[in-house]
Structure formats: C-alpha cells, structure tokens
Amino acid sequence: MNVAITGITGMVGSHLIKRLVEENKTGEALNIRALIRESSLVDHLKAFEDVDYVMGGLEDKESLTRLVEGMDVVFHLAHYPGPVQTADELVKVNVNGTFDLLEACRKARIKQFVFMSACTVFGQVLPTVDADHPLDESHPVMPGSLYGAIKSSIESFCFFYQRSRAFDITLIRPVTIYGVKPQIDKSEWFNTIDYLATNYNVDLKGSTKYVSVDSVTQALEKVMGNADCSGKIYHLIDGHIHNLDLGQMIVDTIDSFGEIEGVKGEEGVPMSNQAARELGVEFSGREGIVEYIKLVHKLQTTYGGDRILDQW
C-alpha cells in the first residue's frame, strides 16, 4: 500500500510513522511518502530512512502533486499554526491549501483521503445533548472559533470530493491530545509536571476532554484502506478531567511536595466514542494519563534542559 502523510513532524504524525513503520499491523508492505517543510525539526525522523520525504508545504501546489502521485491513501494531519499569523493567512494556507491537496488527490486517482479534523467544529451544542444522549457524530456542526471554522470548511470539501466519487474520505475528530512531542517541552501538561517535579505550588483552573496520541494513531491505522470507513466520522475522546484533579494525579505520581490550588472547571458536554470503540480503538482512561506523567517526568529527569529528542 502506498501512503502519503502531511504533518509528519507534528506529534500525531511523528507517532503515526512510528506505528506504521515499527509495528505495521496491516499485514502488507507500506511505501510511505511524507511532506515536510525546510524549516521543520526532523531529528526524530532520522530512524525512518525508508520514508520518501517531499520538501514543500500546503501553499506549494507542485510539492502537493509530487506528494500524492501514485499514492493509495493520503493522511492529512498538517495544520498551519496560529495565533501569530493573521486570520487571512490561516484561512488561505489551511483551507485553500487543503483544497489544492484534494484536487491533487483527485488528479492522482488516490483511493482514500483521511483528514484529522477536531471537535472544535462544535461551537454550539443542542440542548438535547445530555448524559443519556451524548454528543455524537450526527450532531450538527456550528463552529465558534476560527480554528473550528477552518476544520469545518475542510470537512465540507472532503465530503464534496467523496460525493463526486473522486475518492473515499474518512474524518477523525479528536479532543485535546496528550502525548510526547518531538520537542518535549511542548507536550501537553509539560509545564505543570515540570513545576510540580521541582516542588513548586501551582494554581489550576478549568477542565479538559482528553485522548491519548496512542488512541489517535490506532484510529488512523484502523481506517487506513478500510472500505467500511468510507464517508465515516469518528470522535476520539477518552474522558474528561478537572485540571485540579490532574494536578493531584501528578503530585501523587511523582511524589511531589508541591501544592495544588484553584477551582474546578465545568463538567463539560457529554460526548460519545462508541463509533471509535466499534472500530476497535482502545482507550486507556486515567491509567494512561498516569503512565504519560511518568514518561514525561522520566524525560525531564534524563534530558534536563535538552528538550529536543532525536530518539524518542
């Protein structure tokens, strides 16, 4: 199977390439091509010598054509970052760039396009959603942020190409993803773990819906080349945690003398992950968070101020 990936230098892309190359549970040989920017940090990708790297970006049509030529499946994980860029730049690169990518895929006659969207497409939630009727993939999309609007726009273009019979599409919508990033100090909850590891007191507010990067890459692998996933959307959510409770988990896990202060956040909108579970995606619950805290603490202890890992 020939597979192309955008966003390989990000957290999800980095973990996906490890899963596909080092584990490869598909049962068939994979030929992987990936799009990278010249300015991207790539030390963590040195181990994957068989990957065919294409230099370019979403704003470079020629590189998109080279990326998808001869490919069967395209994973679109890249998102041009904010908030330092203007809204005009973010829309131009992400929406227009993805349209160019989709058009290149049509011309290349790929078989499947997998887009990593986000649950931020739900800015407004219907009053019918409650614990007995959690928000699922059938809920209407009404973005309340620029990021959500960009993701929603791209989803619409994906369905346009599917319904015009250009290729199959599958959408993945994760909530906040935790996992080790190649630049580890950018990893989710890194600073809180770091402060408590040095016995500082921290003030925490709010709450978070979470899912591990392992569950996300499981989902991506399971939908890859899977005809049953054509036209489907999958919500990836493991659970909801108050940041005060998360802080206490960190204290208990790393034996910190730091103290936690603050107030609990809202309970959050109930969300369903039933479709992902039926796909076979496994979720590790709070035990997964504990293991992640241990791993980040170990990396902090091992690498100190050297926050970029070439082997991770």
Feature locations, PLM:
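N-terminal Rossmann NAD(P)H-binding glycine-rich loop of SDR-like oxidoreductase domains
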Residues: 1-26
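NAD(P)H-binding glycine-rich loop region in Rossmannoid oxidoreductase-like domains
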Residues: 50-51, 55-93, 104
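Glycine-rich NAD(P)-binding loop of the Rossmann-fold in SDR/ketoreductase-type enzymes
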Residues: 59, 89-100, 141, 145, ...
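Active-site Tyr-X1-5-Lys
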Residues: 142-170
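Mid/C-terminal beta-alpha module of Rossmann-like enzyme folds, strongest
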Residues: 207, 219-268, 272, 304-311
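NAD(P)-dependent short-chain dehydrogenase/reductase
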Residues: 159-208, 213
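Conserved Rossmann-fold NAD(P)-dependent oxidoreductase catalytic core, especially the SDR/UDP-sugar
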Residues: 100-146
